[in-house]
C-alpha cells in the first residue's frame, strides 16, 4: 500500500451514517460472542489510553497493553506533567525570592525544600495515573500490564509485569508506543551525572552547574527549573538557533528573555567528548563547522537532543510493517499501516511529537475503525514552551509564509501596552498575527507572554475555522485581560488598531529599539 506523505496527513473521510450504524452494530455483535477484541492498543500514553477509551465508548471490545505498569506514558509519568509541576514550584520560589518585594510583600527568608517539591510533583503524577485507571474501569477497557509484541497481525504476545505471559487477540491493533530519549554518540546516560529528562525530574540536590545539550522545548524548560533554583545553566546547541520551529522574531525575543534570567547559550556548537572520571563532568566542545576545541566543566549534564520513535522489540519486522529511515511507522490518511488491521498513532508516526497531537490521532483512528469520520490537521496543532514567559504558536511562521510566496500582513501588539500585564507588573512579550493579504485569513499566531499557553487557543479555534483577523478583532474581549492583546494584534493585522493604541505602539516600539541598542552596546 502506498503510504501518504506528511504533507498529506490531514485525515478526512466521508462515510454515510447508515453505513456507520450497520458497521458498528456488527462489531458490537462480534464482541459479545467472542473472546477476541475488536480493538487492541499497544501503549497506554496520551494517544493509547485516549484511543482505548474512545473505542470502548463506541461499543468496541477493547484491551490496552502498557509495559510501564502505570498509565499515561512518558507525558504523565516522566514528561509533561511532572515537568509542569516543577516549573510551577520553581517559579513560585523565584517569585517569592525576587518579585514579592515589588508588590509590598516582605519575607525574612525563602528556602527551597527540594524533597517537598518532588513530593508535590509525585503526588500530582500518582493522582492522575490513578484517574486514568478509573476511566478504564468506568469505560470497561481491559488493561494488561506488560510488554507486548506481535506474533501475527492479529495477535500480541504480552510478557506481563508479574512474570507471566498471555496472548491478546484483536481484529484491529493500534500501535501507540510513543517515543524515547534520543541518544548522542559518545554520551552515555547514567541518570546520575549525565541525565535524560527523566533523571532531570528526579535530582536529589540542586547542581551548582548544569549543562543542557539541546535547545528545544524540554531542554529550555528543565534548564529553567534548575536555573530558578540556583543552578548556573549553559545550553549547548548544534544549530544556529534555539527552538528551530519557532517564528524567528519571537525566538530572538525569547532568547533575550532567557539570557536576562541567567541562562547562557553556546550555539553552533557540538559535544565531541565526555569525561566523567572526576567528581563532575568535563565536556569537550567544538564549533559545529569545525575548529578549536574547548572544555566545559559542570556537575550535571542533561541530554535533551530530541526523541526517537519507540518501535524496537515490537515484532514489526515479523509481520512486515513498513517504517522509514528513523523507524517511524508509515501510515495512510486513516492511520493504517501496510499490514491490514494494524494501525499506528502518536510519536511513532510522522508529525509533531506532542501529547495532544497523539490524543487527536487516537480519537480519529478509532473513529475510522468504527466507520465514522476522523479528522486531524497537523498544520493547526499548537505548540507551547512552558518557560517564563511562555511561548505558544499555531499555524505558520513568517519564514514559512514567505517561503510559500503568499502576500501577507503582520499585526503585532506588545504586552507592555496591555493594561492587565502592566497592573501585575509582568509585561514582557507580544502577540504576532500573520494573515493573508487578500482574504485576511489567519495563517499563524505567535504569542510570548506569562500565560501564552492558554491564550493561544483562541487562535487555534480561529485557524481551525479559517477565520480572519477581523473576526477575532470584532469579538468583545473582557477588560482588563491579557487576551485583549490578541484582539489588538488582530486589529493591527487588518490595519484598524484603536486610535489611542497607535501612539502607544509607536512610543513603545521606539523605546524597545532604544533598549535593545543600549543593551547590545552595554554588553
Curated annotation (Swiss-Prot):
Cofactor binding comment, as recorded: Binds 1 FAD per subunit.
Catalysed reaction equations from the record: 2 Fe(III)-[leghemoglobin] + NADH = 2 Fe(II)-[leghemoglobin] + NAD(+) + H(+); 2 Fe(III)-[leghemoglobin] + NADPH = 2 Fe(II)-[leghemoglobin] + NADP(+) + H(+)
PROSITE patterns associated with the record: PYRIDINE_REDOX_1 (PS00076)
UniProtKB keywords: Disulfide bond, FAD, Flavoprotein, Mitochondrion, NAD, Oxidoreductase, Redox-active center, Transit peptide
GO molecular function: dihydrolipoyl dehydrogenase (NADH) activity; flavin adenine dinucleotide binding; leghemoglobin reductase [NAD(P)H] activity
Pfam families attached to this UniProt entry: Pyr_redox_2, Pyr_redox_dim
SS bonds (residue pairs): 75-80
GO process annotations (BP): 2-oxoglutarate metabolic process
Sites where the protein binds FAD: 66-75, 84, 148, 177-179, 347, 353-356
EC top class named in words: oxidoreductase
Cellular compartment(s): Mitochondrion
Primary localization: mitochondrion
Catalytic residues (positions): 479
Cofactors demanded by this protein: FAD
Matches recorded under InterPro entries: Class-I_Pyr_Nuc-Dis_Oxidored, FAD/NAD-bd_sf, FAD/NAD-binding_dom, FAD/NAD-linked_Rdtase_dimer_sf, Lipoamide_DH, Pyr_nuc-diS_OxRdtase, Pyr_nucl-diS_OxRdtase_dimer, Pyr_OxRdtase_I_AS
Superkingdom of origin organism: Eukaryota
EC number: 1.6.2.6
Biological function: Reduces ferric leghemoglobin (Lb) to ferrous Lb.
Family statement drawn from the similarity comment of this UniProt entry: Belongs to the class-I pyridine nucleotide-disulfide oxidoreductase family.
Record-given protein name: Leghemoglobin reductase
Name of the encoding gene: FLBR
Amino acid at each position: 500500500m502506498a503510504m501518504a506523505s506528511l504533507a498529506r496527513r490531514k485525515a478526512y473521510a466521508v462515510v454515510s451514517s447508515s453505513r456507520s450504524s450497520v458497521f458498528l452494530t456488527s462489531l458490537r455483535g462480534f464482541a459479545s460472542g467472542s473472546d477476541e477484541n475488536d480493538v487492541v492498543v499497544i501503549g497506554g500514553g496520551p494517544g493509547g489510553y485516549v484511543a482505548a477509551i474512545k473505542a470502548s465508548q463506541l461499543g468496541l471490545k477493547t484491551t490496552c497493553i502498557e509495559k510501564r505498569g502505570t498509565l499515561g506514558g512518558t507525558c504523565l509519568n516522566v514528561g509533561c506533567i511532572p515537568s509542569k509541576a516543577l516549573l510551577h514550584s520553581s517559579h513560585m520560589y523565584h517569585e517569592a525570592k525576587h518579585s514579592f518585594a515589588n508588590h509590598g510583600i516582605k519575607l525574612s527568608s525563602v528556602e527551597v525544600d527540594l524533597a517537598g517539591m518532588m513530593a508535590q510533583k509525585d503526588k500530582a503524577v500518582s493522582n492522575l495515573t490513578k484517574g486514568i485507571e478509573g476511566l478504564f474501569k468506568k469505560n470497561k477497557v481491559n488493561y494488561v500490564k506488560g510488554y507486548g509484541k506481535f506474533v501475527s497481525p492479529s495477535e500480541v504476545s504480552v510478557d506481563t509485569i508479574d512474570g507471566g505471559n498471555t496472548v491478546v487477540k484483536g481484529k484491529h491493533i493500534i500501535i501507540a508506543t510513543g517515543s524515547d530519549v534520543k541518544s548522542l554518540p559518545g554520551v552515555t546516560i547514567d541518570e546520575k551525572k549525565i541525565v535524560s529528562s527523566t533523571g532531570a525530574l528526579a535530582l536529589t540536590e540542586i547542581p551548582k552547574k548544569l549543562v543542557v545539550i539541546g535547545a528545544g522545548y524540554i531542554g529550555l524548560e528543565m534548564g529553567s527549573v534548575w536555573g530558578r533554583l540556583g543552578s548556573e545553566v549553559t545550553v549547548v546547541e548544534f544549530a544556529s538557533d534555539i527552538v528551530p520551529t519557532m517564528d524567528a522574531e519571537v525566538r530572538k525575543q525569547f532568547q533575550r528573555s532567557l539570557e536576562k534570567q541567567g541562562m547562557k547559550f553556546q550555539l553552533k556548537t557540538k559535544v565531541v567528548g565526555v569525561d566523567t572520571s572526576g567528581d563532575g563532568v568535563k565536556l569537550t566542545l567544538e564549533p559545529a563547522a569545525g575548529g578549536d576545541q574547548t572544555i566545559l566543566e559542570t556537575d550535571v549534564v542533561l541530554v535533551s537532543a530530541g526523541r526517537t520513535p519507540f518501535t524496537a522489540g515490537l515484532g514489526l519486522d515479523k509481520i512486515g510493517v513498513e517504517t522509514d529511515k528513523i523507524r517511524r511507522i508509515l501510515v495512510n490518511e486513516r492511520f493504517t499501516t501496510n499490514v491490514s488491521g494494524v494501525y499506528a498513532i502518536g510519536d511513532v508516526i510522522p508529525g509533531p511529537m506532542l501529547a495532544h497531537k497523539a490524543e487527536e490521532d487516537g480519537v480519529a483512528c478509532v473513529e475510522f475503525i468504527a466507520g465514522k469520520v476522523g479528522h486531524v490537521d497537523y498544520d493547526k496543532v499548537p505548540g507551547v514552551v512552558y518557560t517564563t514567559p511562555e511561548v505558544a504558536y499555531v499555524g505558520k511562521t513568517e519564514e514559512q509564509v514567505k517561503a510559500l510566496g503568499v502576500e501577507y500582513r503582520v499585526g503585532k501588539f506588545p504586552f507592555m501596552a496591555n493594561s492587565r500585564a502592566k497592573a501585575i507588573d509582568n509585561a514582557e512579550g507580544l502577540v504576532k498575527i500573520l494573515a493573508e493579504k487578500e482574504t485576511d485569513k489567519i495563517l499563524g499566531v505567535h504569542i510570548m507572554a506569562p500565560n501564552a499557553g492558554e491564550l493561544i487557543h483562541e487562535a487555534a479555534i480561529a485557524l481551525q475555522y479559517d477565520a480572519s483577523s477581523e473576526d477575532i478583532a470584532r469579538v468583545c474581549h473582557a477588560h482588563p485581560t491579557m487576551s485583549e492583546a490578541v484582539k489588538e494584534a488582530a486589529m493591527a493585522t487588518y490595519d484598524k488598531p484603536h486610535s489611542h493604541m497607535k501612539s502607544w505602539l509607536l512610543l513603545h516600539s521606539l523605546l524597545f529599539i532604544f533598549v535593545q541598542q543600549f543593551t547590545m552596546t552595554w554588553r
